[in-house]
Amino acid sequence: MAMLKYGGNAGRGGHQLTERTSEQVFAAREEAAAFFGGKPENTIFCLNCTHALNLAIQGIVQSNDHVIISNLEHNAVLRPVAAMVRERGVQCSIAPVSVDDKETVAAFRARIRPNTRAIICTLASNVTGQILPYRELAALCKEHGICMIADGAQACGTLPVQMSDGMNILCTAGHKGLYGATGTGLLITDTKFPIQPLLYGGTGSLSAKLEMPDFLPDRLECGTLNIAGILSLRAGIAFVKKTGTAAIFQHETTCCNKLLSMLQTMPQVTVYRQPGAAYAPIVSFNIQNLSSEETAELLDQKGFCLRAGLHCAPLAHRAIGTIDGGTVRFAPSIFNTLPEIVALGNAIRNL
């Protein structure tokens, strides 16, 4: 139905269908910006969080710069950085994440060099859910004039993430905690570190020039936008705003705690959490004598959807000692119920 009413190409043409569509896209931009405390013009629609992170990393980091990442990063950070190390002479240091936030910040601080350009880190691990001290890391970046690029894929919509937390660039997915459609993402910048375009093409503005426009969002958005996805993202953000991130976090954490309480009674199960650390609502585990893939397949046969393997985050699995086989990951949503969690726990017990 949305495409019947808003099937125009935003910013291209002056007829009514396009005008209606453009208004909806701008409203979605305003909704996303307001939710994270950013400005609409500095809110960029992306294909996903990986696209947003590539925009930020490749648009900020230059040849011979130095960057610091954590040892919990997703390949959406690790692979762009690795490519820049190979191809542009960029230097990269990896800071270990501790259960003690002060130790984590100290590890990042100890790796700062005169040519450090950016700290690039996840707000919460997609493997274990461990929450990094991102506000303190943002303060560290500000102290040293370093850009902080934040991967918010596992945190946005669940944790109260705001641009006022201090990150310079926030990247996130639309299809996870924001309940939008797949193929959507966001990059929000405070513009203190100008981002060079990653893609070049039509914007519907300054079309006579060969260069990309020098103003946002046009400078970083080119080609036809994912209109249907953007409208779904607007609806998802409105839902999260109405429900409340605190309520979502509480419900999902209650689901995790229920499963954890059941898993702790099963000697054959290993759970990858450490006392003293803060966690987003994610539980990673393994069952003795079963690979993570076998466990997930058996649970799938019983109607439970869990992801197995390395979760595109080999550094995190190396850190917790599961690089050879990965883990099984449970990540509930606001729509899961406690009876469903109990049924999952019983299914795991009976494997």
What are these regions (language model features)?
Residues 1-351:
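Pyridoxal 5′-phosphate
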